[in-house]
Amino acid sequence: MENKKTIYFLCTGNSCRSQMAEAWGKKYLGNAWNVFSAGIEAHGVNPNAVRAMKEVGIDISDQTSDVIDSDILNKADLIVTLCSHADSVCPTTPTHVNRVHWGFDDPAGKEWPEFQRVRDEIGARIKKFAETGE
């Protein structure tokens, strides 16, 4: 994983929020961070998440829906949980790994504007982190 830090975005199904976060992370943090995402379960990438990101010029059609990889988890410099479910049932993390929770609504099963809103909120939060480190 070179000399880059590693950030790991986690949510319940690695279908919507963490997929969008991975894409935004690669856009805003890719020069300094290895960016990964995963879920407690792997539900497949939601087609509306793909569509929402495509609308802002980011192609996530090749991203895969993955369950949490303990190797990445243990080597991560920062773990970001994106929903309360992942925050509460996330595997125990090593003490050297910084873990934060950035909660976002789950757009799965909702109307299209909800995907756009959540996409934009996640993008803004990751951009802020890229700019401020917080």
From Swiss-Prot:
InterPro entries attached to this UniProt entry: Arsenate_reductase_ArsC (IPR014064), Ptyr_pPase (IPR023485), Ptyr_pPase_sf (IPR036196)
Any one GO molecular-function label of the UniProt entry: arsenate reductase (thioredoxin) activity
Active site: C11 (nucleophile), C83 (nucleophile), C90 (nucleophile)
Reactions it catalyzes: arsenate + [thioredoxin]-dithiol + H(+) = arsenite + [thioredoxin]-disulfide + H2O
SMART domains in alphabetical order: LMWPc (SM00226)
Disulfide bonds: C11-C83, C83-C90
Enzyme's top EC category: oxidoreductase
Protein name: Arsenate reductase
Native source organism of the sequence: Brevibacillus brevis (strain 47 / JCM 6285 / NBRC 100599)
Gene name linked to the record: arsC
